[in-house]
């Protein structure tokens, strides 16, 4: 059984027990929450929403919060001293999917 969920403008294909990295959420570790934006569920038969399935809920548990590795962006043009180097670290929340209810 799997589900396709939407969180933070991104879509994820999840199964029970999966561990995902979501954008930072203001929840404590070990807290559980429900994701109601379920786009599709496959439990032997595929059910699609338009855009979301009514009554379908995915339950998840927060494991921890952290920061990703630094992503370097470098832009260089052919003129003298025409370069820019920037770094970015994404804040994330690590989440475990505990239950899929269709």
From Swiss-Prot:
PROSITE patterns: RIBOSOMAL_L21. InterPro entries: bL21-like, bL21-like_sf, Ribosomal_bL21, Ribosomal_bL21_CS. One of its GO terms (molecular function) is structural constituent of ribosome. It comes from the Bacteria. One of its GO terms (biological process) is translation. GO terms for cellular component: cytoplasm; ribonucleoprotein complex; ribosome. Keywords: Ribonucleoprotein, Ribosomal protein, RNA-binding, rRNA-binding. Pfam families: Ribosomal_L21p. This protein binds to 23S rRNA in the presence of protein L20. Part of the 50S ribosomal subunit. Contacts protein L20. NCBIfam families: L21 (TIGR00061). Belongs to the bacterial ribosomal protein bL21 family. This is Large ribosomal subunit protein bL21. It comes from Sulfurimonas denitrificans (strain ATCC 33889 / DSM 1251).
